[in-house]
Amino acid sequence: MQFNNTWLNELNGFHTTLRPMPLKNARLLYYSAELAQDLGLDERLFDAQNVGLWSGERLAEGMQPLAQVYSGHQFGVWAGQLGDGRGLLLGEQQLPDGRKFDWHLKGAGLTPYSRMGDGRAVLRSTLREFLAGEAMYHLGIPTSRALTVVTSDEPVYRETTEAGAMLLRVAESHVRFGHFEHYYYQGQTEKVTQLADYVIRHHWPELVQEKDRYLLWFSDVVQRTARMIAGWQSVGFAHGVMNTDNMSILGLTFDYGPYGFLDDYRPDLICNHSDHQGRYSFENQPMIGLWNLNRLAHALSGLMSPQQLKQALAGYEPELMRCWGEKMRAKLGLLTPAKDDNNILTGLLSLMTKEGSDYTRTFRQLSQSEQLQLRSPMRDEFIDRDAFDSWYNVWRQRVLQEERSDEERQQTMKLANPALVLRNYLAQQAIERAEQDDISVLARLHQALSRPFDDAPEYADLAQRPPDWGKKLEVSCSS
């Protein structure tokens, strides 16, 4: 493994250097073998005797851990200085193919930015983040991922006493909108410029020599954010806490906390029980994405003219709608756009809202429909079967215009409509067993989530509607 730390070497004063605080009797609970292989890691690194590498007791050569400082808007209100309160950027892994990945250890102990926290993470939240990153990655949504989950005998006090844990998160970058806000609101505009130049140099090197590099860069940040959120909306993912300090400059989904996937199609779903006003509801995410980009634009106002910032921001909605429309047409089995496609989509979504239909299962079942069937077996899932039959007939006539075989259409539709997603109750079942040192449920769920688009009878039980108790789970920011 080859590591360095360009953040440390190139950005003086943007962080505090310190070492992780190891946990009591730490042990490696689980890891992603697939990600380890992609990173070129020897499987022997995950033997019990090497737990120190994943628990902060031992640093690999070239690692220089540090805590980053940033600020942000939380629930629409300026929160001031935040920063890595329990996580450390260990270093950047350099792969032979030129790719670079941050290694970030979460739950690594107190930092100067811990505020009132204890610097620790609990097993419950680390497993939720691990599973979320894996699920989103295999759904094709840009995301951070987690390599390892470490548990311990160290008690951590939240609503109850829980096991202290650590998560090793891997991402191309951990730069957030809030990094730029921090220095802007401190009046350190030269550091805003320095940070922008750093990000462009390392992640947009093709723009370094461009005269309008800041405009071109910010425009791409806007577009990436739009595409990320379009992906969220297409798979029914609600992030839960879209504060500006949780927004990636690369358009990656990260900082998984009180997230959730739609069960019943409820556009107003609020998955964070601390979000009393519904600011971060599922249907509000596209709007919040733009609001957050406006906050970033404000922080970058010293780098571009107001006209340039408006020009970049103006690209958000068209790109969001283009990408979302493309994904939703694919979910309906439509290759080429037609003028009535939006009516077909809204007709189905309205019917699903009225009926309380399961979002993931409804689209997956539609993928299996045969276009010569005058009546779909899906109708039995609906109370108002006449309304469904009416919609189905319109959809069927539209699909026939595509002039594709059932087999071809079904295959492409299945690639747009997962058979299973990470429902909260599935994660909870895996967590409860893992807390008893039984990782069998976790491992099985992880394997299933790596094949979300497959017809996999062995995982059919994971693709069902949640039981009643599973619909009533509440998730908070507590982690």
From Swiss-Prot:
This entry's Gene Ontology molecular function terms read: AMPylase activity; ATP binding; magnesium ion binding
User: Cell wall biogenesis/degradation: present as a keyword of the record?
Assistant: no
Q: Does the record carry Membrane as a key word?
A: no
Q: Where does Mg(2+) bind?
A: 246, 255
What is the reaction catalyzed? L-seryl-[protein] + ATP = 3-O-(5'-adenylyl)-L-seryl-[protein] + diphosphate; L-threonyl-[protein] + ATP = 3-O-(5'-adenylyl)-L-threonyl-[protein] + diphosphate; L-tyrosyl-[protein] + ATP = O-(5'-adenylyl)-L-tyrosyl-[protein] + diphosphate; L-histidyl-[protein] + UTP = N(tele)-(5'-uridylyl)-L-histidyl-[protein] + diphosphate
EC number(s) reported in the record: 2.7.7.-, 2.7.7.108
Quote the catalytic residue positions: 245 (proton acceptor)
In the record, the note on similarity to other proteins reads: Belongs to the SELO family.
- State the HAMAP family in the record: YdiU_SelO
- The protein here is known as Protein nucleotidyltransferase YdiU
